[in-house]
């Protein structure tokens, strides 16, 4: 077999195409995709391709004159199986070993797997990773669980960036995968007051199960006032995990003095923000995006040790031909947390309960 199926995003649309199975280069490994989560950033790049590509061009990820019709082979939250090693590799893990990794290619200048034009992503049957970043998946950890390692690492990194005291009060805004990951990390860190804020009442139960001590519907109650009352002389720390642009200025206006705001949501459009309030109140505004390899490894260990109930985060699964339908579902209001793609099979979106 020399060809494989791959999901490509182009001009805001997804399609399944047949392409050649890639050949691993020096230091690289060919892997078979076993499970891959649909990330909010996959949705964002599909809906706002031009905005994302403008950022890529300004950061030097894409050429300045590159067109917006570039294909992206999506998929960066993965579990995979080692198929073949490229040259200049050690081959310490046997072929057939299940692995995951930080989704970048050091051998390609640190480019992101599944988000960068020209690279292979894990929505494909096969793709390329770096040997140096491989982590074996423990036998007791299902592949779909290991695919949730990446968003857990994003949440863990945000919490580490916050440098909270356990008596500080956390507000986690948005109870999607990153928000839940942050809640879980806060709980494991020992933070005593964790307020989950989400307008979808359906998110209340899972937020509490992941470790929130309180749930607030922000359309009905003031989560910032609730946190400030609990904090007393301690700090309020707001984790913006929703990616809703207007919320950033809103929290700058409402946050109490000396509060911290940790921004994990990706805002690609220009924002109208009045920083005078942040200056006068001496707010700490911290942006959090990626994570360290140690945080990724810790997230996999948290799954393996049962510290995080990953099953409750996984709400759907789909085969490679059903990915467009899954995206259509996620484009609209829905109750899904994390949909797992299994590129090795076909099949439409199915709901899964934890």
Protein language model annotation of sequence segments:
Residues 260-262, 273-312:
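Rossmann-fold dehydrogenase core element
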Residues 22-36, 51-105, 138-140:
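Glycine-rich beta-strand-centered segment in the early N-terminal region that forms part
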Residues 162-165, 205-284, 347-354:
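Glycine-rich cofactor phosphate-binding loops and adjacent beta1-alpha1 units
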């Amino acid at each position: 077999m020399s060809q494989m199926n791959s999901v490509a995003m182009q001009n805001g649309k997804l399609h399944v195409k047949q392409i050649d199975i890639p050949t691993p280069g020096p230091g690289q490994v060919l892997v078979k995709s076993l499970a891959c989560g649909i990330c909010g950033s996959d949705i964002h790049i599909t809906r706002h391709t031009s905005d994302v590509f403008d950022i890529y061009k300004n950061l030097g990820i894409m050429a300045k004159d590159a067109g917006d019709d570039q294909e992206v082979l999506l998929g960066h939250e993965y579990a995979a199986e080692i198929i073949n090693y490229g040259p200049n590799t050690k081959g310490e893990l046997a072929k057939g070993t299940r692995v995951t990794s930080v989704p970048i290619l050091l051998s390609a200048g640190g480019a992101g797997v599944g988000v960068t034009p020209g690279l292979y992503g894990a929505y494909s049957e096969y793709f390329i990773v770096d040997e140096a970043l491989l982590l074996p998946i423990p036998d007791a950890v299902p592949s779909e669980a290991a695919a949730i390692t990446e968003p857990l690492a994003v949440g863990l990194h945000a919490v580490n960036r916050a440098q909270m005291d356990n008596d500080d009060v956390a507000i986690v805004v948005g109870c999607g995968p990153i928000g839940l990951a942050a809640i879980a990390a806060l709980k494991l860190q020992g933070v005593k007051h964790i307020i989950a804020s989400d307008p979808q009442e359906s998110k209340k139960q899972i937020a509490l199960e992941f470790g929130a001590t309180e749930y607030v519907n922000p359309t009905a109650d003031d989560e910032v006032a609730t946190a400030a009352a609990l904090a007393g002389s301690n700090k309020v720390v707001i984790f913006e995990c929703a990616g809703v642009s207007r919320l950033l200025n809103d929290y700058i206006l409402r946050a109490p003095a000396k509060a911290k705001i940790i921004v994990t949501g990706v805002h690609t459009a220009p924002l109208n923000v009045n920083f005078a309030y942040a200056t006068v109140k001496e707010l700490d505004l911290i942006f959090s995006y990626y994570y360290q390899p140690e945080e990724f490894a810790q997230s996999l260990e948290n799954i393996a040790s049962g510290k995080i109930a990953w099953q409750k985060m996984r709400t759907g699964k789909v085969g490679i031909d059903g990915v467009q339908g899954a995206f259509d579902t996620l484009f609209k209001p829905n109750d899904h947390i994390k949909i797992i793609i299994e590129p090795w099979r076909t099949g439409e979106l199915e709901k899964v309960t934890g």
